[in-house]
């Protein structure tokens, strides 16, 4: 075996030695776009040297290709360490492509940090002296808040505070008409007008907070007053944003130039921002400006005010007077000892129809939009980059083939992390896009809901070995067919939502072929300890394979919302109340949704727009063919086998939470009327599985585990999560694991150290 490995290694060395060397171009902050870019440093006469911008390097490559053709080894553009300021993204088109054997690579010089920034430094500060402004400031902020003239920096456009295109689930409420999944199999809808990405403020590379109140938590709605009542399965509210608020704090907001509120107005998983139209101080009544929230408003929901000069009351908050172009800021420390930047550029790279282009080892930060967008093309890579402090997403990929995001660190996004969309769903032809070995965390800073760390939609995409944590909503959202999710670690997400999932998909019988395996999901509880799911297959989602996963302290690890043909096997559940949930919602409140799909199938021969009884769907997913003849509303075909359900060696979490003795009944939550439809086989329930070291978080099984006799297969737990290689942006990787809040009692929660990668 060793001899074989040596032979292979030798062949690889020979291959590497004979491969054509790439042509090199150099870029440096002190370069000159009139130079050739063939020298890494300026010559003695300073007549030649590196280029100053990536755009000039791109143009030089275009010239090379026109005169002598693409070099056999491709081209490497090496960026020296230093700061590169962007006003607009670099545009790369089909003419800027490489080939599989001769790629175009833009990379940082080894050992140096090439910092691409869309920010502008703000250095000219002065104290606030205007009596009218001082009068509006919180007493604690007077003398602490400073101001800067953004117009003097040429910054006159500040973006919008209103609704971004918001990904929201359709027909989770009965009063929303279902439109069906789109061509890529996504059941998420883009609602609202497109807006200009907004300016943000950063201090010493940390995002600061647009002034808000409360600084933590929310204000409750005490009563709704809108004239148009709504009733969603007994949950009552109104359509208009007209309500009584608790407390008296909004009294301070009267007279604000541009006051806004952001709230969860009807459901805990759907937010929207509104401009305040009026406040009646005597009645404590607020009206918000239309358009109103999609789902309406109801008593007991929560909101906060923002963009309020009067609410700069703690260090780190800021406000922009958009009419005068003045930034007001309470710095966390004396501003002369720090660095203040405001975001200006929309992003850094925009690839359209480009192929075989790699961005490697670059640090991209402080932009209003998405750092890298890739549209169509093939074989492009974002490798080992750090993408942070972005207004929207880190990387988006739309269409094309085999694009990849590998080994990146991504955090501080206003939206999500990596969005992968591609493949031909009608033909079930895979795109082959992938996200691997990325560390994605602290995202959803601005768009709180449905901005996941990873979003996959289409056919044949893969997410593997990613570490995702600390977010208000989901880690992974997906739609389409034939995706693979494996070796990912997820914790402490869904922190500001109820009824959500760390991994979520929903609402179709045809979104089949997905494999969710060898993932570690832990410390997931939702807002205030409310309902949160590990893997959430919502509203009739069908035919996922959930195997070899480890769930630790997840309130509801696997949730099947009335779907069919799902396989849950060979998983480990530790300290997880109601480890498996399967309901029959299509036989009840979700019946109208199912009826709509059945009607579509009978009248058009399609389900969700696809011809499910014809190839390729009929051959790839045979159970679809006879779906209508097999009581489609019933959750048939679900299998739960060879799983380990263990309350843990500490106090039984289920007994404490549900007030019942630790009997087998509490390991699941299956609707009684459909329990006979679910196949249960060879599960190990509340019998010590004999983990190697449970308290240290090692859930491998010892040789004497009783699970082996049931046919349990080894889970490669040691391979889950990030791994070290030349493509990783950083190593080691440390991440703190947050504790489980109430209602889970502290004595039922064991301390789990962060996993050092």
What is the meaning of each model-derived region?
Residues 292-300, 306-310, 332-357, 365-375, ...:
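Beta-propeller domains
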Residues 87-95, 101, 105, 543-557, ...:
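Predominantly extracellular beta-rich ligand-binding scaffolds that present long acidic/polar faces
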Residues 355-365, 378-391, 401-415, 427-444, ...:
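Right-handed parallel beta-helix
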Residues 22-376, 381, 388, 396, ...:
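Extracellular polysaccharide-degrading/modifying enzymes targeting complex plant/algal/animal polysaccharides
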Residues 78, 85, 91, 105-107, ...:
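Extracellular beta-strand solenoid repeats
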Residues 88-89, 368-373, 391-398, 414-420, ...:
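Short glycine/acidic-rich loop motifs that flank beta-strands on beta-rich extracellular proteins
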Residues 23, 73-75, 82, 88, ...:
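The right-handed parallel beta-helix/beta-solenoid scaffold, focusing on the short coil/turn
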Residues 4-15:
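Bacterial N-terminal signal peptides
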């Amino acid at each position: 075996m060793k001899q074989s490995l040596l032979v292979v290694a030798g062949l690889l060395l020979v291959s590497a030695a004979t491969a054509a060397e790439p042509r090199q171009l150099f870029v440096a902050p002190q370069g000159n776009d009139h130079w050739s870019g063939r020298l890494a440093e300026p010559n003695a006469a300073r007549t030649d040297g590196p280029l100053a911008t990536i755009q000039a390097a791109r143009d030089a490559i275009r010239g090379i290709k026109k005169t002598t053709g693409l070099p056999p080894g491709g081209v490497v553009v090496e960026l020296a360490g230093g700061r590169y300021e962007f006003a607009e993204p670099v545009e790369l088109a089909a003419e800027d492509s490489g080939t599989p054997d001769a790629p175009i690579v833009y990379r940082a010089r080894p050992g140096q940090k090439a910092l691409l920034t869309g920010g502008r430094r703000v250095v000219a500060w002065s104290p606030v002296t205007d009596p009218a402004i001082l009068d509006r400031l919180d007493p604690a902020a007077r003398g602490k808040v400073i101001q800067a003239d953004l117009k003097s920096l040429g910054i006159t456009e500040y973006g919008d505070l209103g609704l971004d295109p918001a990904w929201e689930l359709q027909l989770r409420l009965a009063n929303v008409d279902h439109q069906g999944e789109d061509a890529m199999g996504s059941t998420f809808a883009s609602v609202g007008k497109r807006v200009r990405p907004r300016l943000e403020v950063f201090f010493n590379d940390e995002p600061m907070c647009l002034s808000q109140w409360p600084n933590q938590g929310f204000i409750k709605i005490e009563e709704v007053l809108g004239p148009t009542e709504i009733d969603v399965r007994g949950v009552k509210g109104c359509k208009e944003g007209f309500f009584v608020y608790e407390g008296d704090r909004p009294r301070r907001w009267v007279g604000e130039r541009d006051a806004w509120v952001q709230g969860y107005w009807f459901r805990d998983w759907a937010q929207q921002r509104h401009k305040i139209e009026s406040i009646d101080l005597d009645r404590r009544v607020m009206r918000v400006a239309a358009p109103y929230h999609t789902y309406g408003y109801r008593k007991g929901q929560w909101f906060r005010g923002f963009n309020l000069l009067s609410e700069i009351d703690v260090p780190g908050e800021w406000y922009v007077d958009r009419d005068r172009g003045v930034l007001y800021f309470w710095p966390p420390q004396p501003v002369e000892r720090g660095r203040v930047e405001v975001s200006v550029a929309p992003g850094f790279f925009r690839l359209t129809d480009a192929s075989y282009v790699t961005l490697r080892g670059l640090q991209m930060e402080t932009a209003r939009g998405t750092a890298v967008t890739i549209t169509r093309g093939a074989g492009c890579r974002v490798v080992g980059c750090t993408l942070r402090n972005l207004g929207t997403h880190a990387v988006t990929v739309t269409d094309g083939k085999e694009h990849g995001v590998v080994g990146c660190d991504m955090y501080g996004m206003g939206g999500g992390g990596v969005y992968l969309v591609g493949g031909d769903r009608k033909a079930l032809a895979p795109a082959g896009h992938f996200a691997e070995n990325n560390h994605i965390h602290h995202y959803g800073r601005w768009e709180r809901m449905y901005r996941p760390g990873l979003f996959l939609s289409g056919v044949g995409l893969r997410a593997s070995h990613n570490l995702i944590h600390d977010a208000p909503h989901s880690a992974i959202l997906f739609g389409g067919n034939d995706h693979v999710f494996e070796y990912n670690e997820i914790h402490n997400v869904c922190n500001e939502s109820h009824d959500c999932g760390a991994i979520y998909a929903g609402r179709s019988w045809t979104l089949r072929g997905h494999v969710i395996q060898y993932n570690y999901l832990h410390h997931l509880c939702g807002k205030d300890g409310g309902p949160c799911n590990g893997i959430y297959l919502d509203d009739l989602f069908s035919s996922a394979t959930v195997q070899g996963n480890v769930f630790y302290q997840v309130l509801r690890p696997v949730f099947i919302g009335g779907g069919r043909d799902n396989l849950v096997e060979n998983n480990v559940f530790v300290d997880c109340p109601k480890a498996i949930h399967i309901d029959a919602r299509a036989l009840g409140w979700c019946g109208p949704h199912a009826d709509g799909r059945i009607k579509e199938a009978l009248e058009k021969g399609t389900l969700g727009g696809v011809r499910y009884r014809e190839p390729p769907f009929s051959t790839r997913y045979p159970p679809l063919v006879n779906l209508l003849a097999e009581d489609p509303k019933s959750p048939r075909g679900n299998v739960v086998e060879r799983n380990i359900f263990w309350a843990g060696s500490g106090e039984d979490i289920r007994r404490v939470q549900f007030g019942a003795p630790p009997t087998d009944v509490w390991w699941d939550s299956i609707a009684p009327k459909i329990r006979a439809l679910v196949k249960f086989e060879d599960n190990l329930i509340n019998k010590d599985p004999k983990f190697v070291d449970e308290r240290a978080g090692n859930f491998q099984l010892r040789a004497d585990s009783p699970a082996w006799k049931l046919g349990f297969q080894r889970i490669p737990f040691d391979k889950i999560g990030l791994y070290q290689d030349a493509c990783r942006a950083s190593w080691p990787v440390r991440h703190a694991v947050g504790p489980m809040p109430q209602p889970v009692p502290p004595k039922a929660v064991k301390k789990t150290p962060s996993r050092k990668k």
